[in-house]
Amino acid sequence: MDQNGYNSSALQRPPRRGDEGCEEDRDSRPHHHHRHHHHHHHHRRDGDLPAGAVAGEAATASSNAGGANAHQHSTFSLRSPKPEYRPPPFSSPNGHNHSHHNTSTSSANHSLQSPPRPALPNPYMSSSTGAPGGPVAPALPPPVGINSSSSPGSSAAGLHQRHHQPGAPAHQHRAAPPPVSPLHPPVAYYPPGTNTDIYIPPPEPKPASRGFYDPTTDTTKERRISDAATPGASWHNANANAPPAGTPKTRDPYSYSQTADQHTPSYYNGGSYTSPRGPSYNRPRSPLSHSHQNPPAGSLSPPGQQPLLASPSVRHGTTANMNPTTNGASAIPPFKSDLAAPSPPKPAPSSTTSRANPMSFDSILSSSEPAPKPKEPSPIIAREPEIKEEREPRRDRESKRDSREPKQTKRSLEPELDHDTEVEKDVETEPEPLPSREKEKEPAPKKRGARKSTKGRASDIRDAATPKNGRRLSVKKESPTPRLPAKRQANGQPKPKTWSAEMEKKIQNAESDIENRAANLDADEFDEQQYKERAQKRRRVMSELDVEYGLSRRDALANTISKKLVLHAELGKRRYDDVFYDEALHEVREQEVYAEKERKKDMQRKRRREKSMAVTMEQKEAALARAEAAEDETERQKHLRDAERASKKAQQTKLILQKGIKGPARNLEINLEGGTMSSFQASDVESGEAGTPSGKRKGKGRSGPRLKKSKEQKQAEKDSAEAAQAALDAGEELPTKEENRVRIKIKKTKKDVAVDSEKDKDEAEKTEEEVVEKKTKKSKDKDKEKVDDIPDNEKRFMSKGYNQIYDQIWRDMARKDVNKTFKLAVDSYATKASNLKKTAILASKEAKRWQLRTNKGTKDLQARAKRVMRDMMGFWKRNEREERDLRKAAEKQEIENARKEEADREAARQKRKLNFLISQTELYSHFIGKKIKTDEVERSTDNPEIAKDAHQTDQKMLDIDEPTGPVIGKVTNFENLDFEEGSDEALRAAAMANAQNAIAEAQKKARDFNNQGLDMDDEGEMNFQNPTGLGDVEIEQPKLINAQLKEYQLKGLNWLVNLYEQGINGILADEMGLGKTVQSISVMAYLAEKHDIWGPFLVVAPASTLHNWQQEIAKFVPEFKILPYWGGASDRKVLRKFWDRKHTTYRKDAPFHVCVTSYQLVVSDVAYFQKMRWQYMILDEAQAIKSSQSSRWKALLNFHCRNRLLLTGTPIQNNMQELWALLHFIMPSLFDSHDEFSEWFSKDIESHAQSNTKLNEDQLKRLHMILKPFMLRRVKKHVQKELGDKIELDIFCDLTYRQRAYYSNLRNQINIMDLVEKATMGDDQDSGTLMNLVMQFRKVCNHPDLFERAEVNSPFACAYFAETASFVREGNDVAVGYSSRNLIEYELPRLVWRDGGRVHKAGPDSQVAGWKNRTLNHLMNIWSPDNIRDSSDGSKAFSWLRFADTSPNEAYQATHQSLIARAAKELQKRDRLGYMNVAYSDTEDANFTPAHALFQIRPRQNRKPLADITNEGILSRLMNVAQGDYDESGLGRLEPAGRPRASAPPIQVSCRSWASEFERSEVLFNAPIRKILYGPTVFEEKALVEKKLPMELWPTRQMLPKPDHEKKGFTNISIPSMQRFVTDSGKLAKLDDLLFKLKSEGHRVLLYFQMTRMIDMMEEYLTYRNYKYCRLDGSTKLEDRRDTVHDFQTRPEIFIFLLSTRAGGLGINLTTADTVIFYDSDWNPTIDSQAMDRAHRLGQTKQVTVYRLITRGTIEERIRKRAMQKEEVQRVVIQGGGASVDFSGRRAPENRNRDIAMWLADDEQAEMIERREKELLESGELEKQQKKKGGKRRKAENSASLDEMYHEGEGNFDDGSKGVSGTATPATAATPADSDSKGKKGRKGTKRAKTAKQRLAIADGMME
């Protein structure tokens, strides 16, 4: 104890943050007491704080928080109150802190992903932050009577607002004081200054509640002034006499003086209690008030003496130090008090007693623990120097250091972020204050404490600069006049206030009275009651908190469990797949092996049969040769029989082979793309012998197979049918069918039946014996006769064979016929018995008829008569029906014969009619050709160096003079022409007349159009010129064109102008890249310049080329005003205003000249386009209207336009029907809808494929002559001299092992023969299956990963994972913390964790662990340095250390340090002994060992220094043989053979305590250990080098060794190998080598694909190879396409352009690329041709090379062959090639299914299929089956077309509508498509599913 009566606690262990089980208790907390001195405090701002102040603030932020109390939840304790209590020390004003206050703070090291466990918040503390500005959130005010922690910020404003609050109950007994937030600023108690000469004016009165501006907060919202935040409120009267909340009373300012004898340390009931305020105390002030001046002399200024004993409030205050930057006001927590300031005579408030002196101490600051009686006062010392800190024991200091959290490598104390934020509560019931002596039994009403503000005030920091003077103000503001609002200065501080002398005197008197009356209180009684009340309140508050937190925990648990269940459900699915995957794979493999075995058996069986057939044929030939050479007739007959037998056997074998090889039974059907997929088996073909080759039953009869009929039975049936037909024709009656005789069986008794059966058996046996004897006798006689006739040398053979055959026949009869005969006999017996029974019944009726002569007989007679009449009527009806059927059959036969004759006559007529139509068209073309001279224009610019095409034949033009006389009338009615008997001259004259009329009509139409424009010109609407009469003129390049046209382009312009002059439409079919766009623009420029025709012109183009057209027109003819007609509906509505003006004159000043739009918008806005009269309509990429059935074709045909121009580089894409549609579009009057002409044009040329004949030369010439005038086509090699030919190379690739496995698996799952047979029959149901199969095979050829991608594999993670932060929201740098947590958590209560629950952790409640640690590890440990030093002399225990080169301190550290610390220290040691072995390597020094290392034998012989001499070269390999051998073995680079099935983070303790979080972070993220394992970072090493730090000061090098496995590393996550991804595909491997070569040579590549999924995979490959690329496919937006093409054209660093063949092959210019690669080819050659011409076009200066990757021996070879055939058709038709064009392999459209099926077969199978098909065709069965199939309507599968399969998810590039539009042509007669579109019941306009043929036609581009 010191002289003031304080118990010294310097040696007591202070509680620390991190101590387990250490719930902060007042009795166990160390306290240092300082003398209170007078200091002048000056206000400082944050920026002006001294270093010591800041350090003090940080160091004392959590001085009272224990390690386990970081989550301070409750201060309730059931332990008995301690008799001893030490008051807390006060920190010095300068911010000096004590060592025992340097406790650890909470570390909020929780990542974004892993929020920490929320601790139970203290109901009496507020959430706080470490910043001195403001709190995290408003905190819950402490309940009445409970201490509240200070403000979150380190300002006194928050302290006073909370501590000086009225209405709080008195401080009661408690086991532990209220906890303080670890981040609260230190509560320092400052002795006030000694200046007493300054007068303080009284403060101005304030309203009860008023908001004020707080400059320290970041909000503009005014805060409410709490009653506790009033000026002058002190700890003494903070809670005294609390008025009702919200109605505070005004206070009277006062000043007082006091002598030293008033500080007698008596307790409450001791009778000598004095004021607890020391003489040197300043009165604490509100943060709203200014610093008060010192009172004048004579006032109650406290003398400069220390009190003998601190007041109970001081002793029971918190240990938190005051922030040195505060106002100097006391931050001691408020305690309940019933004292109130004196007031003028008025009724006392309800919260005070009725004693004479309301300031008595009967209810002031009771403690929860009754303190002992204070001792007598010691002499008062006026001023005493500050007590210095006492040094704590070493153990305590070490424990404190251990309790700190390792934030970085050096542990630093940081302010703790308290995440526990409370909501303020209004406590409904509070303990009543104890009555005074006069009114002990009068209960005081309970009052609710006022709400407190939790925000800090920066004004406190500012007020520190003003001198302070302690003043005490009563909580009761009972001034007679209300206080006015305080005036504020400019900086937000209130103006200073002064006290009146009268008020100070009143206060002095009142306080003296209080001190005198305080001795009569009974402390024991008072404390007991208050203690119980507070305990009861704590229990109530805790129960409420438990309920609240229970709800939150339940919600959190429900969410957690739901997530677990979802996760386990997903994992269960994965486990199921993993468990049964191997089983399924094993089963599939077994089936595959079985199927392969069966297929091999079938092949062996086939080879054996073929060999047997060959041997049999050889035997036949030999037998025939012997028969010819035989002289004897018998021998010759024998040889002939042998030959016949051999021939029959060969025929049977041949039939078996023709039926096909029966494949193995398959239970697994392939279905790789979804949808239903049939399986075709050869068994179906065999079952088809019963009638239908398809093997399908016709009716719903027996489910089993039909009985097979022999060939003889079939022939007999056929003969009988022919005989019956002949009899019918001759009028004879057919013979009646033989009926089985009815045998009546009479029922007998059992005895008779038994007798009869015995007789029957005997007779039957006898009969059989007789029959057998007769037969054998006859047969013997016959055999004998035959044997006699046969030569002797052949008798022995014939008899034996005959007997065998005879026996075989009888065996067959016994096996087959006996059972049937028995069944027939049984049936006949049953029928016989039934008839006999009926006969008996009838006989009995007849016998009794005389007895039944009544009315009933009459009725029966009538019924029988009616029945007889009905039977007769039925008989005659049947008879008449049969006669009628016979008559109809005869009439039908006659009609059929007449139809055949009529068909023959009609065929001849149609032939002449077709000839007439062709002649008419030829004449028209001849007349037009002479005017337009297309042939001259086409070849006038040919390169003379290029030889004439070898296939080009001389066209023999028609030598016909153009008639000059009057034009004969047009023959429109073909019925007037006699095609049967009319002369050829008359037909020719009619054809010439029609041709002339067609020309005249075209010209008249143009003149009418122009004249109409002239007529309308008068009204000011249109202004068209009439250039028709200008004739043939040679024109020059228009000056409006800002470019120089080439010669061939100028010729093309002349041709187009001549077409326009004649009013004829045309097709500009120049090869792609020759400038069709420029030529069409030049025509419009010519019309504008020469004839002042400025439009309107309409350009319709695909959506991808709209921007290109707009740019080209603006570039070449800037004077044209372009209307870009695209966009949304609202945008187009605005654009249409340009042509909706009725009085628009299309001159140069017109609103627009050229309208550019797309095909889709033309169809959607057809009504608006048809209103306009277009001068010229240009259709770019005219193959978009190649189908005359499409809606766009008919919509464009109905537009009002003078001329039409079609631009296409590929006029023929798939068949001639497309070219017919284009010609019909440009000349509807000539190429009209005559079916004969269309059929000849489209089908007759291709029909030769059925018979594999060659095209007729005359027909080809006539076809070319028809096309010549209307179509102008030039090719690049003829007109473009500087553009060389493109080089096309086919690169054949082989299937890899994985691809072969996939391919063979697919082949084994299907039966090619069945597919072909069903496809030949035209079964639509199987067309989807065929297309699906084609897609699967093409996927295999491209890459097997298209079926199944190799995914990233990892063990099953038994852990929780937090959500990953969004890189889009957070940026590139995202803080990713440790968030993995095990699914298994060890729940541990907080009390067990902290309060001695862990016995191995030392703490206040676990003294055993502390005693063990101190005793065993320190006192009784022999490894202490002192003991080692004492035992090192002589031969004592540790004398060996001097030979082991170990000091006592090193030995102590080795036994007391952790393993990682020792390992790091060993790593830092320099191996001096090993290097000595290197230095002293001579023989004489080999055994040299220093004296201090005699026992270190192993380090002396260490070879590691030798191995570490060098790290490279041969010497390094010699010194590290084992490591080099391991590296060369490649074991570290192999794929891991296995991986763990599951992984999980360590199981952790789950405790609602910050201490557990600290320990976890200490274990998992220990900064020193991480630094030791991983070493310095790259940035640190750079800094060390730049700073030139000495090597001995460098940190420890990395201790973590490199992983043994290079690929695996330290993780179990396996990433798929990209190298394997490349080598799994033969195509990709070839492409990899090719791209490497092209890149090195500086080429740029266009890479085309058919499948968008393959483009996705190719992007991964290009990223892997670091090739720069860009991509364009059907899903690319319109605006992005333009930018992508521009980037590739302008940025040479882009190496590859990935394109979809359909999307990237139209209308874009990519001339910067010189290499084109087709990863997979299209079966339409024009699509590929368009794609490669993106680079091979005008502007290309390099040699263009085209590579085509084809997989050898697969379906791709056959698709390529088919494309080449189509290419040849185009060349022949368009260029007029020679007549030797072989169309072998071509198929009619209806046989396209068969072509696709043939692609799936190999060469051997294809040959067999051809042979089988030929046999079926010869036998006529094929036609029968096709007729049967045609009679059935089958519902088409709604499956996707091949085109859609290729480009799934890509979208339609040209945005065209593909709906079938009803009629094919505008003819009057309805076509089948028309009738189909209407459907039944008038369902017009409904969407009908396309048939498989239509889908195939779409895939080939034949229709839309």
Curated annotation (Swiss-Prot):
Key word Nucleotide-binding present: yes
Pfam families linked: DBINO, Helicase_C, SNF2-rel_dom
Pro residues compositional bias, start-end: 176-189
Biased composition (Basic residues): 29-44, 446-455, 695-709, 1826-1835, 1880-1893
Domain Helicase ATP-binding: 1057-1229
Motif (DEAQ box): 1180-1183
PANTHER family documented for this protein: CHROMATIN-REMODELING ATPASE INO80 (PTHR45685:SF2), HELICASE SRCAP-RELATED (PTHR45685)
Function: ATPase component of the INO80 complex which remodels chromatin by shifting nucleosomes and is involved in DNA repair.
Domain note: The DBINO region is involved in binding to DNA.
Record family assignment: Belongs to the SNF2/RAD54 helicase family.
Protein name per the record: Chromatin-remodeling ATPase INO80
Taxonomic lineage: Eukaryota, Fungi, Dikarya, Ascomycota, Pezizomycotina
Name of the gene encoding the protein in the UniProt record: INO80
